[in-house]
């Protein structure tokens, strides 16, 4: 067995209690011919000092924009949301996060708005985000996460899950990983390796060297272990 448990500790801070009702925004995922919900994903704002420090740590020009892009792509690929072009945004990210001008977001037909900011606190990545109901002019949810900088991609997936669940009522699936058997080499001598990746295809890693045949990998739902079939001295074994 291979332990794939990630020791990621998030400090989840509820800034404001989410309103109990869904307001005017509802995404019905049970009916056919669904019109995706127009959503504006504003780039997460970041102060100059934090931007510079994270650029050195992560080799990213703007980690706030990178996290926002992950959220945008996740929502789009779900088929339930239509992220609007940032070229149409009328309000700067830092101002929108403090107090959105809902008339501006209504003007570009956004029904939901996601804002937030990124800061460096003692070399930790702190990400705050807010979900707004543009039609009702209300905040729906506000959360914050603190983690090590290298977990910035996962923060984007977790935000996506929170937004998805808040707007659809169904649990999100973006912060998940896929275990699979990768094949390479010529047709007459294929090499199979156990591999794992994020659900969006990022962070692909090989878990075995390809010295032995591997088949049928499965996640254990209780302890986050991976079980797979392999052959040792031509005998099948479960690992």
Predicted stretch roles:
Residues 25-26, 95-162:
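Amphipathic beta-strand/beta-sheet edge segments enriched in Tyr/Trp
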Residues 16-18:
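N-terminal signal peptide c-region/cleavage motif recognized by signal peptidases
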Residues 115, 178-183, 225-229:
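Residue position within the beta-strands of beta-propeller blades
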Residues 152, 166, 211-229:
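Conserved beta-propeller blade repeats
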Residues 28-101, 114-117:
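Short beta-strand->alpha-helix linker/helix-N-cap micro-motif
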Residues 188-205, 225, 229-239:
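Beta-propeller blade-edge and WD-like acidic-aromatic loop motif
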Residues 170-174, 221-222:
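Residue-level detector of Asp-centered blade-edge/turn motifs that repeat once per structural unit
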């Amino acid at each position: 067995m291979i332990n794939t448990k990630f020791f990621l500790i998030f400090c989840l801070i509820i800034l404001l209690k989410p309103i109990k009702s869904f307001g005017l925004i509802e995404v019905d995922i049970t009916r056919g011919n669904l019109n995706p919900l127009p959503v504006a994903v504003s780039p997460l704002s970041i102060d100059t000092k934090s931007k510079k420090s994270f650029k050195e740590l992560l080799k990213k020009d703007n980690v706030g924009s990178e996290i926002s892009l992950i959220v945008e792509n996740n929502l789009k690929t779900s088929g339930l949301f239509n992220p609007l072009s940032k070229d149409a945004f009328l309000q700067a990210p830092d101002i929108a996060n403090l107090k959105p001008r809902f008339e501006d977001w209504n003007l570009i037909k956004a029904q939901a708005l996601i804002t937030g900011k990124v800061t460096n606190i003692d070399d930790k990545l702190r990400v705050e985000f807010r979900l707004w109901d543009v039609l009702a002019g209300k905040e729906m949810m506000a959360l914050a996460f603190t983690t090590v900088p290298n977990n910035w991609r996962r923060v984007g997936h977790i935000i996506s899950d929170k937004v998805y669940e808040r707007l659809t009522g169904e649990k999100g699936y973006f912060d998940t990983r896929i275990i699979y058997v990768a094949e390479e080499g010529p047709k007459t001598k294929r090499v199979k390796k156990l591999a794992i990746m994020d659900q969006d295809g990022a962070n692909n890693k090989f878990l075995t060297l390809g010295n032995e045949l591997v088949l049928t990998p499965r996640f254990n739902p209780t302890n986050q272990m991976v079980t797979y079939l392999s052959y040792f001295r031509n005998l099948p074994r479960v690992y």
